[in-house]
A protein has these predicted regions:
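Catalytic-loop motifs flanking and including active-site residues across diverse enzymes
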Residues: 148, 215, 259
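Catalytic cores of processing enzymes, dominated by hydrolases/peptidases
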Residues: 198-252
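Short glycine/serine/proline-enriched coil/turn segments at secondary-structure junctions
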Residues: 41, 55, 143, 212-214
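C-terminal accessory segment of soluble enzyme catalytic cores
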Residues: 2-3, 15, 228-300
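Arg/Gly-rich low-complexity intrinsically disordered repeat tracts
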Residues: 26-28, 35-63
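N-terminal lobe of the biotin/lipoate ligase/transferase fold
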Residues: 1-28, 32-33, 60-197, 202-203, ...
Length: 300
């Protein structure tokens, strides 16, 4: 990890995982296009239970956490909302974990480790295409966000959960792995780059920033996203890496709401959370009136 002495931010960099790059690139996982409920028995013994990942969870009730569905929202607007929530959490104005679920209009973002040298087309071309480039403080390289990609930004107090950054990243991978398994897609980790992969094709990405124990930014799962803009960059800063989507692996479009529902269920299971829906307007009210707790709406 890198540390910014000015802002006390810790940024995630790739680490060693349990799958070697050679094994990942040479494997050809089978794809089950049948019943979405079908699970791959190869993963039946996989540990995605937070009670076994962290034994302290076995005797604790699930942590209360707000789930906010933002729909399709401009990247900079969502980024500002995240930093506002993180600031409120650091100051003690908000004491509850919050996860933002959303999609972005087309945008390229540059992480701490990825610059414009990984852009394979001219910036003039991107301007003509109407796609902005935004530099952010998350870990990782250049990436693309767009409609059809499910993004989750968990703004979580890692210290309160007694979970380290490496385990938290592994948990986000578990969430995506279990989600795509629901539709019979076998994905796996890659020791060269965090996220989830189908062979040499990346299906889900992770980029985090941590400020005083509070996480922000998060995961991006390619569901029905247009993959063409990914060909205009070197994803993850790696040559010969391609992106894939659940739609491409299955040969059919998926309802985003269904995928989002499963992702929420996996957040609850993996991180031992009790997600309760609240609205964007209620969240804004709490940021403006810190003594007012946003009302819980119907379940997620």
């Amino acid at each position: 990890m890198e540390t910014s002495s000015n802002h006390k931010l810790r940024y995630l960099l790739p680490g060693v995982t349990d799958v070697s790059l050679t094994d990942t690139l040479n494997s050809k996982p089978s794809i089950n296009n049948g019943n979405p409920a079908t699970r791959n028995p190869q993963h039946a013994t996989r540990n995605t239970n937070s009670a076994t990942r962290n034994p302290q969870h076995a005797t604790r009730n699930p942590e209360f956490c707000y789930a906010v569905d933002l729909g399709r929202i401009d990247y900079k607007a969502a980024w500002k909302l995240q930093t506002d929530i993180v600031s409120a959490r650091v100051k003690g104005i908000i004491d509850t974990d919050i996860i933002l679920f959303l999609e972005h209009p087309a945008v390229f973002t540059l992480g701490r480790r990825g610059g414009r040298d990984h852009l394979l087309v001219s910036e003039e071309f991107l301007k003509t295409s109407g796609i902005p480039i935004v530099q952010v403080e998350r870990g990782g390289h250049i990436t693309f966000h767009g409609p059809g990609q499910l993004v989750a930004y968990p703004i979580v107090n890692l210290k309160a959960h007694r979970i380290g950054v490496v385990d938290f990243v592994a948990a986000l991978e578990d969430i995506m792995l279990a989600t795509v398994q629901t539709w019979g897609i076998t994905a796996e980790r890659n020791s060269a780059n965090r996220g989830i992969w189908v062979g040499n094709n990346k299906l889900g990405s992770i980029g985090l920033a941590i400020r005083k124990g509070i996480s922000f930014h998060g995961l991006a799962l390619n569901v029905n996203i247009d993959l063409k803009p990914f060909s205009w960059i070197q994803p993850c800063g790696l040559e010969g890496v391609w992106m894939t989507s659940m739609q491409q692996e299955l040969g059919r479009e998926l309802p985003m709401n269904d995928v989002c529902t499963v992702v929420k269920e996996q957040f609850e299971s993996v991180l031992d959370l009790n997600l309760t829906a609240t609205s964007f307007s209620h969240l804004q009210q709490q940021l403006q009136n810190p003594n007012q707790r946003p009302p819980a709406e119907h379940g997620v």
